[in-house]
């Protein structure tokens, strides 16, 4: 989340609270999808299926610090390990935002050149993976540091 954009385009006296809440929600989703991926890897590893309700509840409850009922162990699944795609997208989102800020400044969102970069990057739809998109920008593939820094900065504010 770009704090400058939020401050410029959002009204109200509780912007810091909003940024903190949004960041905590994102952190929750990151932890949830990482836990889902871990569980799905275990589920599809060919192990004992009778252990999976307990594994599901244990993994998600540990990751999120709230109890998850065992009954959802087959409902809370995405096809083809799609949880991994979400995680990669969130990682790349932070990388891309960082790239645009480094290239155009803190108000990168305000420049037409930013839109041109984004149009060029995404004009082919889903032809490219996030790794290929990062490579096209000259970035390291799936670098977690921008995401860590964004979360840390937003929670310290």
Which residues are covered by each model-predicted region?
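Acidic/histidine-rich catalytic neighborhood
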Residues: 1-41
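C-terminal, non-catalytic "cap/extension" segments appended to globular domains
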Residues: 43-157
């Amino acid at each position: 989340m770009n704090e400058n954009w939020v401050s410029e385009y959002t009204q109200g006296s509780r912007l810091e609270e909003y940024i903190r809440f949004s960041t905590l929600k994102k952190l929750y989703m990151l932890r949830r999808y990482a836990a889902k991926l871990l569980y799905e890897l275990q589920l599809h590893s060919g192990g004992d299926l009778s252990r999976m309700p307990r594994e599901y509840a244990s993994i998600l409850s540990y990751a999120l610090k709230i109890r998850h009922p065992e009954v959802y162990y087959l409902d809370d699944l995405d096809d083809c390990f799609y949880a991994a795609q979400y995680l990669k997208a969130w990682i790349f989102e932070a990388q891309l935002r960082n790239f645009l800020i480094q290239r155009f400044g803190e108000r990168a969102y305000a420049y037409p050149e930013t839109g041109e970069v984004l149009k060029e990057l995404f004009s082919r739809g889903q032809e490219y993976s996030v790794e290929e998109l990062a490579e096209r920008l000259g970035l390291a593939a799936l670098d977690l540091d921008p995401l860590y820094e964004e979360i840390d900065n937003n929670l310290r504010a």
